[in-house]
Structure formats: C-alpha cells, structure tokens
C-alpha cells in the first residue's frame, strides 16, 4: 500500500470522529480534511462543527448541503419501490449512507486526497455501506476504518485520548443512547433497549409525541402525488425536502411513525432500535393508496416483489450496483401512472388514508357495485373459473386414477 498523504474523513462532530482526526495524523502522518454531510439532521447538530473539526486537527472542513438531493434522488426512488426492510423499517439510516459516501468521494477527488475514512464500528452495517460505495465509485482510494485498527474500545478511552491532546470536546461519559438523524428519520439504540424485555421509555423517542399524549382531535393532510412522487401538500406545491419536513412536523405532533424493532443486521447479529419516521410513514401510506387505484393485479404483485428485493439491496449497502439500478428503474416505470390525491387522517400514532382518487384509476364503481348492474354478466365467471382451475382439476383426476 502506498503512503497516505491526504485523507477525507466523513465527520459528524461526535466523539468518535473527533478522536479519529488526531489519530489519523499520528498513525498515518497525513493531512486530514473533514467532510460534513447535511442530510437534514438539524441545525443544532451542525452548529460550530467547522470550528470543532479544525480544533481537532483537520486542515479544513467542507459542509455539503445534501438535503434536497437525498429526498429527491434517494428517498423518493426508494419509496416508489415500496421498500420496507423486514416489514417494518423504512430504511432511514440505510438511505442516507450512499449519498454521504458519494459526496465524500467527490470531495476527496476534488481536493486531491488519496484516502477516505469513516467512523463506523466493526459491528454495524454502516461500515459495509460506506465501503461498498467507495469501492463502486472510486476503487483507487485507500479506505481507512479506525474502529478496526485502534485500541480505543470505550467512550472513556476516547475522552481520555482527546484530553491528553488538549482537544476540546463537549461529549461526556453519561451518554447512554446511540442516535442517528436525517431528514427521513431518527434512530435510537443502546441503553435500556439492549434488553428486549425492557420497555422503551421517553428517552428512546426524541422526535414524535407519545401517541397517548397526542392531540385528542384528529388532523387531516391532503397529499398530491404525481408519478409516484409527492409534489404538493395541503394545496401547496413543495420541493421534496420541504414536503417531507412539513409532513414530519404534522406526523410527529400526532405520534405517527414510531416502531420498536429487532432487526437482522448484515454482519450477522440482531439489534434493537426505536425508529421515528413520521413524514415517511405518511408518504408511504399515500403512495400505496394511489397504487391500489392505479396498478393492475400483476403490476401490483411485481411492485411488491420489487419492494422486497429493494429493501435488502438498500439495507445491505448495494445502492451503487447494476441490480439496484435496474430495480429502481422498474419501480419508476411502474410509477408513471401513479398519480392522484389522497387525504390522510393523523390520530394517536396512526396515519389512515380516508380518501383517494386518481384520473388513472382502474377502479370502476359500475363494475365493483354489489347492487344491481347492467355492465357485468355473472355467467361469464363460470367459464373463467373452469379454465383457471383446470390444472387443479387435472391433478385431482390423476390422483384418483392412481388410487384405483
């Protein structure tokens, strides 16, 4: 391996990546450039982050505003597939990683770096997601993963490491929970959640109201969907990020989008987390409602198949692969007629579709009515059923012959 001279670090401003900066300089004798991705984690998380990076030893700090791109080019395409990992998880952390890695690589190439670095632990999925993206986008770059190299194995050790070098740090030993936030969701892991028999408490939820304490009066939101994408909410045209932000606020107020799950990590272990995805939950319900009107049976079944495969590809860090690209393209084609208007009721943790319509709807009241009608000849069903069940009939006849 050739000597590393300049490395671009995916920097969050947290304890881990603050310690990584001096560690890289000491162990690789290289220049460290901090790269910060603004994916909607909030202004508080970004306040003073450039100064913090420089104080930790970075030569410079670049902050990339990726909020709109993340929603438009990563979240919306994923939504079209219907991807929900293991039937529950709307892939909040998973979808943020490819865009962060892509922008980090672009930064590395722009500043002439020969290496990239991340602060992911050796137990999690994110190391695979980041390094899979690096390999697909810039295989010539050296990848440094400090958590697989250093001997700093505890929060206390990291704090001592920074204190010994007089590097300021606002972190403390008292931190119990691990959190990850972006425009799509907030995840909370660790603490009481590490025992699956423990109930979550108020510290496990930071974004949404407890449904029990949510407003007693329901609220509705009207969502306009065009080609599988939310383009307006409550009569106002909005950009993807603004639409998500608006629905996040509405959903969080009513306790929408909470899940407490145990999931199968890619690396082979199970983990428990409390995930909050208020706006995403509302968007997903709206899109699926329009699909119910527009997609024929075979197309809907295929979209479900696409969604299942997409959920594993995205979760497993396979965004930048030919298969994932093909899956996303298929979902986008299916979504060309997925346009309509949906009204969603928000109440006590639930997002319930109560009205839906589409100019492309295949639903016909004339054909669907249980009352008397003149458009459907019931006698036609007999021939269809006979042909539809022909294979079963032949199989049964063969079985009867064998038994004689």
UniProtKB/Swiss-Prot annotation:
CDD domains in alphabetical order: ASS
Cellular component GO terms held in the UniProt record: cytoplasm
Any single Pfam family the record assigns to this protein: Arginosuc_synth
Binding site for L-citrulline: 89, 94, 125, 129, 178, 187, 263, 275
Record key words, sorted: Amino-acid biosynthesis, Arginine biosynthesis, ATP-binding, Cytoplasm, Ligase, Nucleotide-binding
Keyword check for Transmembrane: no
Chain segments annotated as coiled-coil in the UniProt record: none
Annotated catalysed reactions: L-citrulline + L-aspartate + ATP = 2-(N(omega)-L-arginino)succinate + AMP + diphosphate + H(+)
Domain of life: Bacteria
Binding positions for L-aspartate per the UniProt entry: 121, 125-126
Alphabetized InterPro entries for the sequence: Arginosuc_syn_C (IPR048268), Arginosuc_syn_N (IPR048267), Arginosuc_synth (IPR001518), Arginosuc_synth_CS (IPR018223), Arginosuc_synth_type_1_subfam (IPR023434), AS_cat/multimer_dom_body (IPR024074), Rossmann-like_a/b/a_fold (IPR014729)
Cellular compartments annotated: Cytoplasm
Oligomer status and interactors: Homotetramer.
Family classification: Belongs to the argininosuccinate synthase family. Type 1 subfamily.
Alphabetized NCBIfam families for the sequence: argG, PRK00509.1
Protein's name in the database: Argininosuccinate synthase
Gene name in the database record: argG
């Amino acid at each position: 391996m050739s000597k590393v001279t300049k490395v671009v670090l995916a920097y969050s401003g947290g304890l881990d990546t603050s310690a990584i900066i001096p560690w890289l300089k000491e162990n690789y004798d290289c220049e460290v450039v901090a790269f910060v991705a603004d994916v909607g984690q909030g202004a508080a998380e970004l306040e003073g982050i450039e100064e913090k990076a420089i104080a930790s030893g970075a030569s410079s700090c670049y902050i990339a505003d990726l909020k709109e791109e993340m929603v438009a080019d990563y979240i919306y395409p994923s939504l079209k597939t219907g991807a929900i990992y293991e039937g529950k998880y709307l892939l909040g952390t998973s979808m943020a990683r490819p865009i962060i890695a892509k922008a980090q690589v672009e930064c590395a190439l722009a500043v002439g770096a020969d290496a990239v670095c991340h602060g992911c632990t050796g137990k999690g999925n994110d190391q695979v997601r980041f390094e899979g993206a690096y390999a697909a986008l810039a295989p010539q770059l050296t990848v440094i993963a400090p958590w697989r190299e250093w001997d700093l194995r505890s929060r206390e050790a990291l704090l001592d490491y920074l204190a010994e070098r007089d590097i300021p740090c606002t972190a403390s030993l008292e931190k119990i929970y691990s959190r990850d936030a972006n425009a799509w969701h907030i995840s909370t892991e660790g603490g009481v959640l590490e025992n699956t028999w423990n109930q979550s408490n108020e510290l496990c939820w930071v974004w949404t109201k407890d449904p029990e304490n949510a407003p007693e009066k329901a609220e509705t939101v009207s969502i306009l969907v065009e080609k599988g994408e939310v383009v307006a909410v409550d009569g106002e045209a909005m950009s993807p990020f603004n639409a998500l932000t608006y629905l996040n606020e509405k959903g969080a107020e009513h306790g929408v989008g909470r899940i407490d799950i145990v999931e199968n990590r890619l690396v082979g272990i199970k983990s428990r987390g409390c995930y909050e995805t208020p706006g995403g939950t509302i968007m997903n319900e709206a899109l699926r409602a329009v699909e119910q009107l527009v997609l024929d049976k075979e197309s809907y079944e295929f979209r479900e198949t696409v969604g299942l495969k997409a959920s594993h590809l995205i979760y497993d860090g396979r965004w930048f692969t030919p298969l994932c690209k093909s899956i996303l393209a298929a979902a986008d084609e299916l979504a060309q007629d997925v346009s309509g208007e949906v009204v969603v009721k928000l109440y006590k943790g639930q997002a319930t579709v109560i009205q839906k319509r589409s100019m492309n709807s295949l639903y016909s009241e004339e054909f669907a009515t249980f009352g008397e009608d003149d458009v459907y000849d019931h006698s036609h069903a007999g021939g269809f059923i006979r042909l539809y069940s022909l294979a079963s009939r032949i199989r049964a006849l063969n079985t009867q012959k064998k038994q004689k």
